[in-house]
């Protein structure tokens, strides 16, 4: 869950987001080491009186500053490619939900059910109940079973949108005429909030996303009540 003045990423709720957090820390450590080395060299050059250097033809130095950046890039690229392929891999999803972006709301269709679909609009500020979040609550939440692989098919009816839920590590563009897909799996129940992350018009800020992850038995009761 996000909180005011938050500096870091939200707590991970899915395996993919946990991998992304590890990769973020891994990359940040490399950037910190490089920055420290550069600052040290700059301070050394500013405080040392250089009277003679033989750097006009230093093959060893050129070899080092060619090979070392290549190694650093490989150390960053390999974990990144691994996570990228993990995010694209979808095998035998337990449930498929089709998401369509509109100006300015989302519509959802549970394709495994004959007639389970609804629109999801933001609740206006004046209609919020005590404890509800401004600009983040919706009239119809997306209820999904936890600890199950769920495929999200995402597209748009009008302009470019982007379906994003940070705590699950999800951000997929909704493009008119194109069907993108992503997968999600939540390891614990709860409410997970997101928003449209592509500027899509005057009410772009009023397209929240709310996922309610529940045990399978609760999801079955909910789906039965919706049919």
Curated annotation (Swiss-Prot):
Cellular localization per UniProt: Mitochondrion inner membrane
Domain of life where this protein originates: Eukaryota
Sequence ranges on the Mitochondrial intermembrane membrane side: 1-14, 88-227
Pfam families registered for this protein in UniProt: COX2, COX2_TM
UniProt topology in membrane: Multi-pass membrane protein
Positions of Cu cation A2 binding: 196, 198, 200, 204
GO biological process annotation, one example: ATP synthesis coupled electron transport
UniProt-listed Enzyme Commission number(s): 7.1.1.9
GO MF term set: copper ion binding; cytochrome-c oxidase activity
InterPro entries: CcO_II, CcO_II-like_C, CcO_II_C, Copper_CuA, Cupredoxin, Cyt_c_oxidase_su2, Cyt_c_oxidase_su2_TM_dom, Cyt_c_oxidase_su2_TM_sf
Binding site for Cu cation A1: 161, 196, 200, 207
Cofactor(s), by name: Cu cation
Cofactor binding comment, as recorded: Binds a dinuclear copper A center per subunit.
Transmembrane portions of the chain: 15-45, 60-87
Tagged with keyword RNA-binding: no
Keywords tagged on the record: Copper, Electron transport, Magnesium, Membrane, Metal-binding, Mitochondrion, Mitochondrion inner membrane, Respiratory chain, Translocase, Transmembrane, Transmembrane helix, Transport
Mitochondrial matrix membrane side: 46-59
Subunit details: Component of the cytochrome c oxidase (complex IV, CIV), a multisubunit enzyme composed of 14 subunits. The complex is composed of a catalytic core of 3 subunits MT-CO1, MT-CO2 and MT-CO3, encoded in the mitochondrial DNA, and 11 supernumerary subunits COX4I, COX5A, COX5B, COX6A, COX6B, COX6C, COX7A, COX7B, COX7C, COX8 and NDUFA4, which are encoded in the nuclear genome.
Role description: Component of the cytochrome c oxidase, the last enzyme in the mitochondrial electron transport chain which drives oxidative phosphorylation. The respiratory chain contains 3 multisubunit complexes succinate dehydrogenase (complex II, CII), ubiquinol-cytochrome c oxidoreductase (cytochrome b-c1 complex, complex III, CIII) and cytochrome c oxidase (complex IV, CIV), that cooperate to transfer electrons derived from NADH and succinate to molecular oxygen, creating an electrochemical gradient over the inner membrane that drives transmembrane transport and the ATP synthase.
Name listed for the protein in its UniProt record: Cytochrome c oxidase subunit 2
Species: Halichoerus grypus (Gray seal)
The gene coding this protein: MT-CO2
């Amino acid at each position: 869950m996000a909180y005011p003045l938050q500096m870091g990423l939200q707590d991970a709720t899915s395996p993919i987001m946990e991998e992304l957090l590890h990769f973020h820390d891994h990359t940040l450590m490399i950037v910190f080491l490089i920055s420290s080395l550069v600052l040290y060299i700059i301070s050394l050059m500013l405080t040392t009186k250089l009277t003679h250097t033989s750097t006009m033809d230093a093959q060893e130095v050129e070899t080092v500053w060619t090979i070392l950046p290549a190694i650093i890039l490989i150390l960053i690229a390999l974990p990144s490619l691994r996570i990228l392929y993990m995010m694209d891999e979808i095998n035998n999803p337990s449930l498929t939900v089709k998401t369509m972006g509109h100006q300015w709301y989302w519509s959802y269709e549970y394709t495994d059910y004959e007639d389970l679909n609804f629109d999801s609009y933001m609740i206006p500020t004046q209609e919020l109940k005590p404890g509800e979040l401004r600009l983040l609550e919706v009239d119809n939440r997306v209820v999904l079973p936890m600890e199950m692989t769920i495929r999200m098919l995402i597209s748009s009816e009008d302009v470019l949108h982007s379906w994003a839920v940070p705590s699950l590590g999800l951000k997929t563009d909704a493009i008119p005429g194109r069907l993108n897909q992503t997968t999600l799996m939540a390891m614990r129940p709860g409410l997970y909030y997101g928003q449209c992350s592509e500027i899509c018009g005057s009410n772009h800020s009023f397209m929240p996303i709310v996922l309610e992850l529940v045990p399978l038995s609760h999801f079955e009761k909910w789906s039965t009540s919706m049919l």
